[in-house]
A protein has these predicted regions:
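Secreted/periplasmic carbohydrate-active enzymes, especially glycoside hydrolases
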Residues: 1-116, 327, 331, 356, ...
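Structural recognition of the beta-strand scaffold that forms the well-ordered cores
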Residues: 82-85, 116-119, 139-142, 179-183, ...
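Active-site-adjacent substrate/metal-binding segments within catalytic domains
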Residues: 48-149, 157-180, 278-306, 310, ...
Length: 599
């Protein structure tokens, strides 16, 4: 009838096109491909199309419990999934976030080997967000619109609230990536709302989990910490499913220069506080002193960034590796606070608001590998983490280097790693004669001899674990480098081949892609790895992916690091040279003072 609506249902018993024979399954990132299907719906009047809609969906099966644990354990298609995620609030503070930018944000989560995004308080609301999570294999912990009870009141209008919840579920439930619905951040909803939500879930979403509280129930826990902690401290947390844990995460020097005026670069003041570097949950007021005590006196902003990239890497790697060590016993998930920054910030991010990743992204990428080798920084065990659905036979190699770069100990291990488990290869037998600060390099090769995981640590002797100041005295290593560019339709790939022909370790080698024509950074851009360390006589290749239109001609790769220099190199369409601005000695010594108002 005119001015009316009607619900039309299609039943697979009577609609043959709803049957999918031998479906290709949708998997979260790392566990398999993200196979998606399209359902075409149309409404016709007298044989002519009046309206149509294409609906994307994936075929997968979720379950939320296992026989050997009471903790929330998510399985997809019968395979237990260790949740490695990031929290999102607003995707962008002003909600100015076109699909192209959003895709870069979500793709960087995929590159970091994450498999979940928590849509904190439901603040990401676009169809693009869900479509891209489907595409890149990011499970969505989705939430309704109730903040922590301390941060916001209960809904005033019950009927309007429930209508909004119903609309949200109906609008987005076709997306393969949504794995559960959560009612409230860090608190329970009022009983009337909780009861109504449970009824609504039974009606509209009987196969997805309803979680009433993001911080309680079946091993789920929130409440941080949110400030920088030493790596070994991250091994002490025993919560099974951690929905919030974070750290200071300082961006690159260029990102800092871009987010505040030059007058504020060399003084930690209120402008820094405006970008979240202040007292409070992030611990920004105590961070500079901690950095100096751990790594040595901070000379200026460039030195602060240099030391902070080391701190970023240590904290974010340990945040995930500490959970790896307890894989499914009891740990079933970790979601860092936060992975995506809504505004330019010094904290809680794995890339900056301008989309340049800092060392935190590559630390997470390392720790969140499906097959991973690690040094337990609490017990001293070498551990192999196997997230695969099949057992692993492999060979591991351990090498220890003194601060001067000399190799002082090596050992090989035969590895038999069970599926979905952490396997200890034993405590390292630390040799005599170690320097006060030394390095540990780990490698894991599969049965065919292919390298599947490697890891690198800087470490101090017991009793002085937090004194790494000797690193500040490392001699400069000049790396040999070659670059090559490959252009294909829509993409350019730049391969950077680095070789350490010296006798010292080259620590935290960092690449940054720029346009040659104007020396501006190319953002976003995707690195196969970054902030890498090379022992003497080691070679590594990093591949950079960019769009030819973003390069607008020739490319320029800049190199910096903890103690890294580089010989200039070039080939067709690309040049490589030292990032002079990132060098500590390029800038005056200021000590980076902190004003009283910012403490």
């Amino acid at each position: 009838a005119p001015h009316s609506s009607q619900v039309v249902s299609f039943d697979p018993k009577t609609t043959a096109t709803l049957h999918v024979n031998s479906p290709k399954l949708w998997w979260p990132n790392g566990y398999g491909p993200q196979n998606l299907y399209t359902l075409h719906l149309s409404f016709e009047i007298d044989g002519k199309s009046s309206d149509s809609k294409d609906v994307s969906f994936g075929i997968r099966k979720f379950s939320y419990s296992v026989s050997d644990s009471e903790n929330l354990t998510i399985s997809v298609n019968g395979v237990r999934v260790f949740i490695r995620g990031g929290n999102w609030g607003l995707d962008e503070a002003m909600k100015r976030n076109p699909r192209e930018r959003l895709e870069a944000q979500i793709r960087m989560h995929q590159i970091a080997n994450l498999n979940m995004i928590r849509n904190w308080v439901g603040q990401s609301t676009s169809e693009d967000f869900y479509e891209l999570c489907d595409k890149y294999g990011l499970l969505v912990w989705d939430e309704f619109f109730q903040p922590n009870p301390a941060d916001g009141p209960d809904p005033d209008d019950f009927d309007t609230y429930m209508a909004n919840v119903r609309e949200k579920i109906l609008r987005f439930r076709n997306h393969a990536s949504i794995v559960l619905w959560c009612a409230r951040n860090e608190g329970y909803p009022p009983k009337k709302i909780d009861d109504a939500l449970r009824v609504l879930m039974a009606e509209l979403e009987p196969t997805r989990l309803y979680q009433a509280n993001s911080a309680d129930g079946r091993g789920v826990n929130s409440h941080g910490p949110y400030h920088w902690r030493t790596p070994r401290e991250f091994y002490t947390f025993n919560e099974a499913f951690k929905t919030e844990i974070g750290s200071v995460s300082v961006p690159t020097l260029e990102s800092i220069h871009g987010m505040m005026p030059e007058k504020d670069w060399e003084t930690i003041n209120d402008d820094w506080a405006e970008h979240d570097f202040a007292k409070g949950a992030s611990g920004g007021d105590s961070y500079p002193a901690m950095i100096a005590a751990r790594y040595g006196r901070v000379l200026n902003l460039a030195d602060f960034v240099r030391k902070s990239q080391l701190a970023n890497y240590e904290a974010f790697r340990a945040m995930y590796e500490g959970r790896n060590a307890k894989l499914f016993h009891p740990t079933t998930g970790i979601i860092t606070w936060m992975s995506n920054p809504a505004q330019p910030s010094f904290v809680w991010q794995i890339y900056h608001h301008d989309l340049e990743p800092n060392s935190a992204l590559f630390a997470v990428k390392k720790a969140a590998e499906m097959v991973h080798i690690q040094l337990n920084e609490s017990t001293g065990d070498v551990e192999v983490i196997n997230n695969l659905a099949v057992p692993l036979s492999a060979r591991a190699h351990l090498a220890i280097y003194n601060l001067d770069g000399s190799a002082v100990y090596q050992r090989d291990y035969d590895v038999s790693a069970a599926t979905s488990a952490a396997t200890s290869l034993g405590v390292v037998d630390w040799p005599a004669g170690l320097s006060a600060v030394h390095f540990v390099k780990l490698e894991l090769k599969n049965a065919e001899g292919k390298l599947v995981s490697e890891n690198f640590y800087w470490r101090a002797l017991p009793g002085h674990q937090d004194d790494l100041r000797a690193l500040d005295g490392l001699a400069t290593v000049t790396l040999d480098a070659k670059v090559a560019r490959r252009d294909v339709p829509g993409k350019s790939y730049i391969d950077v081949m680095l070789h350490n022909s010296g006798t010292q370790v080259a620590l935290m080698t960092h690449l940054q892609l720029r346009r040659k024509r104007d020396d501006e950074r190319v953002l976003p851009v995707y690195y196969s790895d970054n902030y890498i360390s090379l022992v003497p006589n080691e070679s590594r290749t990093i591949t950079i992916e960019a769009g030819p239109a973003d390069l607008m001609g020739d490319a320029l790769v800049l190199v910096d690091g903890w103690n890294v220099a580089v010989a200039a190199s070039s080939s067709r369409g690309v040049e490589l040279e030292l990032n002079v601005d990132a060098q500590v000695e390029h800038w005056p010594v200021t000590g980076l003072p902190m004003t009283s108002s910012s403490k």
